[in-house]
């Protein structure tokens, strides 16, 4: 899974308008550089959250061929954490970060639209 995460992070940075991500979600290139974020740091701090998000996403979100304009990734993150106790009761700490949710959704093949501005 680590290699898949690195590949997704690299793909985001190579987009027409480069996109950078950390545990908080999408960030500007300046913020990414200022915080000295990198793929290894993301994996070291977010792997547990990505795995939890990866497990619950297919149980909560059906894939469609339409984009979701009603929910932000932040709202979806909260929806996941609120539903962990009912859906995956063995998970002790239901917290996942926004960045982990985004990466896990990409790993599942959910598509995203290039933001006009971050």
Predicted stretch roles:
Residues 83-115:
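Charge-enriched amphipathic alpha-helical scaffolds
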Residues 20-22, 72, 106:
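Generic detector of intrinsically disordered, low-complexity, polar/charged segments
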Residues 1-55:
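Intrinsically disordered, low-complexity serine/threonine- and proline-rich regulatory segments
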Residues 1, 5, 67-72, 97:
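A diffuse structural propensity rather than consistent per-protein peaks
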Residues 22-24, 35, 65-68, 83, ...:
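Detector for Asparagine
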Residues 40-87:
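Positively charged, polyanion-binding regions of nucleic-acid-associated proteins
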Residues 24-26, 74, 110:
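Intrinsically disordered, low-complexity regions
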């Amino acid at each position: 899974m680590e290699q898949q995460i690195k590949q997704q992070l690299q793909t985001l940075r190579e987009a027409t308008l480069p996109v950078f991500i950390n545990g908080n979600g999408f960030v500007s290139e300046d913020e990414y550089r200022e915080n000295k974020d990198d793929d290894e740091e993301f994996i070291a701090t977010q792997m547990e959250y990505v795995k939890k998000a990866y497990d619950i996403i297919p149980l909560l979100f059906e894939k469609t061929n339409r984009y979701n304009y009603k929910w932000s990734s932040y709202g979806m993150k909260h929806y996941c954490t609120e539903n962990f106790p009912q859906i995956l009761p063995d998970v002790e700490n239901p917290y996942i970060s926004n960045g982990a949710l985004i990466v896990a959704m990409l790993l599942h093949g959910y598509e995203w639209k290039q933001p006009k501005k971050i």
